[in-house]
A protein has these predicted regions:
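C-terminal motif of bacterial Sec signal peptides marking the signal peptidase cleavage site
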Residues: 18-19
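Short, polar/charged alpha-helical segment
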Residues: 32-52, 397
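Extracytoplasmic "Venus flytrap"/periplasmic binding protein-like
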Residues: 46-112, 126, 148-150, 261-271
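Extracytoplasmic ligand-binding clamshell segments of periplasmic binding protein
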Residues: 63-64, 187, 199-286, 291-293, ...
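Hinge/lid segment of periplasmic solute-binding proteins
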Residues: 82-138, 147, 166, 291-298, ...
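Mature extracytoplasmic/periplasmic domains
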Residues: 95, 280, 304, 308-391, ...
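Helix-loop-helix "hinge/cap" segment bordering the ligand-binding cleft or interdomain interface
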Residues: 102-105, 121-189, 200-235, 314-320, ...
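Periplasmic-binding protein-like
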Residues: 290-311
Length: 435
């Protein structure tokens, strides 16, 4: 398996040439990222088949794919689902039930982290989708800045400083005093306010759950803004990405980066909150100038974000081949061990994690064993709080926190508007101020 990905890369070129000749693919896979392309390359080489990967951007994924799944017209053989809508999709008649003959994936259950396997089940306990990943989060930080300002870059020591919200504020003050900013924007603190009292957005009585911990996000975000603890570089903006490489202009917002900006207007970001996949798809892709100057540690509370589940379409004409693909991706020990070595992806598949965790290291993190850290964080994940409303209600909440922080509304007005927006989107949900 050591050379398998290299061989597959050559095979993918050959497969591409074959695809150009108009030959119909043996299998069609639809996803929202290109992370499966390397998997497909290996699968094509192993089984001498062609696989067509269709990528739909995340923001359009559900609205584009759902009509095909419901009508059957143009539906893929295999498709992925993200955690934010997974709870909805496992209850729909889209994915084939995998906990039945001839698949019997229920026999795999003990090989996985409990929460990962459980999330792929519907309310009747049928397995509809499976995953190879676990996605706990942490705080990635710059080692050189940590040494300069805090006197150490040791992840355990920095984790102690980050272990409470008050500790985060203290470090933020020290960073600002040295012309650094703790985070790019206030979004990096939300996982830790939510984590103080983890609750589902909607409970079993169909009531919106607004906890004191969630309300505290308004206050912490406003304090971070007022005290200038962040660089005001919104998540996913050009300035946000650039902040991982070095100094950026303070309060750049969504504007493009200009090379001739004055140094006197600049600051440098110390850290950012990201889940496991953020290391590979964000930092390694965009922090090329600071590679090797990073480490990862805990925040005030554990959290997780994202994750990809995969299953086959219930009416696929290629179910045998589709299952072989799924089995290789999530339950082939040799493949997954090689996958970890090639990508650093943190697995939920225990036979491989037990093998690799002891001596794992990542050059980008100056040799840190982030694998062991994330596996320990994964043990703290409480997936019972996940609901099918998380993405939409979370977005509405974030919008109103932003309006308050920017001075567009009072806190009370923002909360009231949030309740109104939830009620408009989901009339059946009872909101706290409902009479």
């Amino acid at each position: 398996m050591k050379k398998l990905f290299m061989i597959a890369a050559v095979a993918s070129v050959i497969a591409l040439l074959g695809a150009c000749s108009g030959k119909k693919a043996d299998l069609t896979v639809t996803s929202f990222t290109d992370e499966l392309q390397d998997v497909i390359d290996v699968f094509e080489e192993k089984y001498d088949v062609t696989v067509d990967l269709q990528i739909i951007p995340t923001e359009n994924y559900t609205t584009t794919l759902r009509p095909s799944l419901e009508s059957g017209k143009g539906a893929p053989d295999i498709f992925t689902g993200e955690i934010v809508y997974l709870k909805d999709w496992v209850e729909q008649d889209y994915w084939e039930t995998l906990s039945q003959d001839p698949y019997n994936v229920q026999d795999w259950e003990s090989d996985y982290m409990d929460y990962v396997f459980d999330l792929g089940k519907n309310e009747d306990g049928e397995v509809k989708a499976v995953s190879w990943q676990t996605t706990p989060g942490g705080i990635y930080y710059r080692r050189s800045i940590a040494k300069e300002v805090l006197g150490t870059d040791d992840p355990e020591e920095i984790g102690k400083r980050f272990s409470t919200m008050e500790g985060l504020m203290e470090v933020a003050e020290e960073m600002k005093a040295n012309n650094y900013r703790l985070f790019p924007d206030e979004g990096s603190i939300q996982p830790y306010t939510d984590g103080q009292d983890p609750q589902p957005w909607v409970n079993e009585n169909n009531e919106l759950v607004m906890t004191e911990a969630r309300l505290s996000y308004f206050d912490y975000a406003k304090e971070f803004r007022d005290k200038k603890y962040t660089a005001l570089a919104p998540a996913w903006s050009p300035a946000w990405y650039e902040s991982f490489n070095g100094p950026i202009s303070y309060n750049k917002g969504w504007d493009e980066i200009e090379e001739d900006e004055k140094d006197s207007d600049k600051t440098e970001v110390f850290a950012v909150s990201l889940p496991t996949w953020g290391l590979h798809s964000v930092l390694k892709e965009h922090a090329t100038e600071t590679a090797g100057d990073w480490a990862v540690t805990n925040g005030p509370t554990p959290y997780f974000q994202g994750g990809t589940w995969i299953g086959m379409y219930k009416d696929s004409k290629n179910k045998d081949l589709a299952f072989k693909f799924i089995e290789m991706l999530v339950h082939d020990e040799d493949f997954l061990e090689d996958w970890v070595k090639e990508t650093g992806d943190v697995l939920s598949y225990l036979p491989v994690t037990e093998k690799v965790k002891g001596d794992f290291s990542d050059e980008f993190l100056a040799g840190q064993n982030n694998y062991e850290f994330f596996l320990e964080e994964a043990e703290k994940i409480d997936a019972s709080i996940i609901t099918k409303y998380d993405q939409s209600i979370g977005d509405l909440f974030g919008t109103e926190v932003g309006n308050y922080v920017e001075g567009k509304t009072t806190k009370e007005e923002a909360i009231k508007e949030f309740y109104k927006q939830v009620k408009n989107a989901y009339p059946d949900i009872k909101v706290p101020d409902e009479k």
